[in-house]
A protein has these predicted regions:
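Conserved, charged catalytic cores of large soluble enzymes
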Residues: 405, 409-412, 443
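Accessory carbohydrate-recognition regions in carbohydrate-active enzymes
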Residues: 5-314, 318-360, 367-390, 395-398, ...
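Long, well-ordered, tryptophan-enriched scaffold segments
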Residues: 434-443, 448-450
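Bacterial N-terminal signal peptides
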Residues: 1-2
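Hydrophobic, small-residue-rich alpha-helical packing segments that form membrane-like cores
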Residues: 399-403
Length: 653
């Protein structure tokens, strides 16, 4: 199998954000929207298992979540090519990672290469003559507590079983069945309840391990391995590399610095890592009620971090992957039908985080053209969720007002007029009561992290958390006063790029008559050093001065989690010059693109060209914007207009 020439994947630097608490991502081998991300786990580890700054390795595991909090999730079926009593260290000069592939050498002479399909990890180990080929496997390894595990030798080259572990932050459980197959027969030694050693004899110098995964059965996990048995390691690697090249070749950019292109395509790559397609070949999937269902008309997805990703990543997938997004949205509707919690349930198919604000995501997909969604199927579950929305703190009330607003729109779509009006009134009254009491009159307490029970933020940051009601904020405060307050917010470094609650706020200047402020702030956030006063949970004792996005292992500002593609999608939107300020609305707010020219090939066959003209300075303000010859006066463009393709031209002063 001949690999395609790397065009845009050559710009991807998988080590961005892998060092310390600066992103919490990993450079593992993965396919787009796959169950597998196979990678070394360091000791001590990050949330994603891997830490660029640490050379000591506890082993190589098959899965992890990208950039999430708590202790992460995954870390299953960890393999060590040396005994647990011996230390294993990465030789950093030999480390390499490209989309779908990871390789390194260890200081003891062992070399490893990793690649993956959607549901199979492929691990190749090469041993020096001084060492006998052997693999120590921990069937109970996990980044959270393991509940149960079981393994059984099936043949001289195969072990099958399952592992059940707690999900992120200790909520709920997932269960993975596996089929582990080796290229050479093994002897099973040092066998214990959850661990074993596989030895291969003195003559074997190279061992390949293929681990198929399934949420349903070991038989399906075995089928995953059998599916690719005629393809060798290089074939699998090339196939996955081609998948990534196709995924990233939908967008071409010109202009900007090389670091800008590297950060852009690395960010683009990370928007397509999840959620995971967990359906069996015949469409079977595990419902969150523990029952197995069969779908004939969609693929079932799992692995959610919606509190973060509804804001940017899923609007990005609505635009660039509408067919897959239809399946993802349908999966969420089925989640409502089989039993949805805000966090993980007890019957998950993969490691997963949380699913708040799914109704906003579903509304966004519908209003942007993905209308073949059966809201009726999940409507009862949605209604139940509306009755248990959290209301303990001001931030929860603001976010619940957003959910109720979206639910009102969904009820209207399916003809439930009484429900729609009830949810609309609840949303408006909840927002008005909360905003006027907690957020309208600015006090010094607005700068205090977690004041009055706020989650990972300040009152300043949550003040803008209901963008659907920006007109009401203007009505109560006045546009000039609100703009002055927003300017103060940025001038005094009260904005936090390192967490999600206020990442849409730079675009509010468009709605307040100062679009040049949006342009200046967004570009600065993407490219310039800035003062960061806040981390994820507290105010820094000494503010951090530096870039929020860097082409380096410390790729994000301190304590800034990449959050499963959220921050990556934020960067991609900003670099292209438009952004979904109000998720659930059909409009994008416009800003100055980072690049001189962007070509976006849409899945409907249309091509959108974004072009800058007359920009002599990188921070020059926009003079006018035209779409297919028509002037855009309000710095907004609808999704349905954008996907027609054509030319979006930015002219500069």
């Amino acid at each position: 199998m001949t690999p395609s020439v790397a065009q845009n994947t050559k710009y991807v630097n998988l080590f961005i954000g892998t060092s310390g608490d600066n992103g919490q991502v990993a450079p593992g081998a993965a396919a787009p929207f796959g169950m597998v991300c196979v990678c070394p786990d360091n000791d001590p580890r990050s949330h994603a298992g891997y830490d660029y700054a640490v050379t000591k390795v506890s082993g190589i595991s098959v899965n992890r979540l990208s950039g999430v909090g708590c202790s992460g999730g995954g870390g299953n079926l960890r393999i060590r090519p040396v005994a647990p009593s011996q230390e294993l260290h990465i030789k950093k000069s030999r480390e390499k990672a490209t989309p779908g592939y990871y390789s390194t050498a260890f200081t003891n002479g062992i070399k490893t290469e990793l690649t993956a399909t959607n549901a199979m990890a492929v691990e190749r180990y090469k041993f020096p003559r001084s060492l006998s080929a052997a693999l120590w496997i921990d069937f109970a390894s996990t980044f959270e507590d393991v509940a149960t595990c079981h393994y059984k030798r099936i043949s001289e080259t195969c072990i099958e079983g399952y592992v059940q572990a707690k999900n992120v932050c200790g909520h709920g459980r997932y269960k993975l069945y596996f089929s582990l197959n080796t290229s050479h027969p093994f002897q099973l030694e040092e066998q214990k309840e959850t661990t074993a050693c596989l030895t291969f004899g003195k003559k074997v110098r190279s061992v390949e391990v293929r681990i198929g995964l399934s949420a349903l059965s070991s038989e399906l996990a075995s089928w995953e391995c059998a599916r690719w048995e005629k393809m060798d390691f290089e074939d699998v690697k090339s196939r996955t590399a081609d998948q990534w090249e196709k995924q990233l070749s939908a967008i071409d950019v010109k202009g900007g610095k090389k670091d800008d292109r590297v950060i852009f395509y690395t960010s683009l790559y990370r928007t397509y890592l999840s959620p995971a397609d967990v359906s069996s070949p015949d469409g079977a999937y595990l419902g969150t009620d523990g029952k197995v269902y069969i779908s004939e008309d969609f693929r079932y997805y799992s692995n959610w971090s919606l509190w973060d990703t509804f804001r940017t990543k899923f609007p990005w997938l609505v635009l660039t992957e509408p067919a897959k997004m239809r399946d993802m949205a349908t999966s969420l509707i089925h989640l409502y039908a089989t039993g949805k919690k805000d966090w993980s349930t007890g019957f998950e198919s993969t490691p997963t985080v949380r699913t708040e604000h799914a109704v906003i995501l579903l509304l966004d997909a519908y209003r942007k053209g993905i209308t073949n969604l059966d809201f009726r199927k999940g409507y009862a579950g949605m209604k139940q969720e509306m009755e248990r929305l959290p209301m303990r703190s001001p931030d929860q009330k603001m976010e619940s007002a957003y959910d109720l607003w979206a639910m009102a729109k969904i009820a209207e779509i399916i003809g439930e007029k009484a429900d729609s009006e009830q949810y609309r009134q609840r949303s408006v009254s909840l927002f008005e009561e909360t905003w006027k009491k907690e957020f309208m009159n600015v006090t010094p307490a607005f700068e205090v992290m977690k004041n009055n029970g706020l989650y990972q933020g300040t009152r300043w940051q949550y003040r803008w958390a209901a963008p659907q009601y920006i007109d009401k904020m203007i009505e109560w405060v006045g546009q000039d006063s609100l703009r002055s307050q927003l300017t103060y917010f940025f001038d005094h470094h009260l904005y936090n790029q390192g967490n999600e609650p206020d990442i849409h706020v730079p675009y509010l200047f468009n709605r307040l008559g100062a679009p040049e402020k949006t342009q200046q702030i967004v570009r600065s956030l993407m490219t310039e050093p800035m003062i960061h006063k806040y981390g994820g949970n507290s105010e820094f004792k000494t503010p951090y001065l530096g870039k929020a996005f860097k082409n380096a292992p410390e790729g994000y500002s301190p304590e800034m989690d990449e959050d499963d593609g959220t921050m990556s999608a934020w960067y991609v939107f900003g670099a292209m010059g438009f952004y979904p300020l109000l998720v659930g609305d059909e409009y994008y707010d416009l800003t100055s693109p980072l690049f001189d020219r962007v070509l976006l090939r849409l899945t409907n066959g249309n091509v959108l060209t974004i072009q800058t003209e007359g920009r002599k300075k990188k921070d020059a303000p926009i003079k006018s914007i035209h779409f297919n010859g028509k002037k855009i006066a309000d710095y907004r463009i609808s999704h349905n207009e954008l996907i027609k393709g054509g030319e979006l031209i930015y002219n500069y002063k």
